[in-house]
């Protein structure tokens, strides 16, 4: 209907800016990664710019998620090293999505049951924050077990962005996402003052 269409066209995703980033964001120095005989990469070198949006593109199984896991210190490179700047605060949106109680509502999960949530040093009305991810009044009361793939992605985005990172690691954030949410996410990233690294297979 017309109301829904207008609401979707106006959809905005608000990405809170985390603490100010210094000059050193994330650097890879001669990084290699292999599992047994299977080499994912060798001699990987890069330096992320403080206000960049960087895409990591490649088919499944080429080590894109492994790269994020190494940046976060969850996995060790086979050789070489990563340097993460002292001002970096990571926020990670992953493919697997951490487990969420299917019986809780969207609002309960994102707000933690509080009327106000802290974004950095400012308080924000929890319902208004949830609404910024295209969950209207009725949608906020939906049980998480009943969400579509796109809605689940928006829920995880809202949770991760609440952490107020200044470096966003987005692992396939566009899977199952509708075109309006995708456009809103792209606009949100353009207005984001930090650095974003987006994994995609296309």
Residue spans for each PLM region:
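ABC ATP-binding cassette signature C-motif
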Residues: 18-202
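Intrinsically disordered, low-complexity boundary segments flanking structured domains
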Residues: 1-2, 163
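ABC-family P-loop ATPase nucleotide-binding domain
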Residues: 3-27
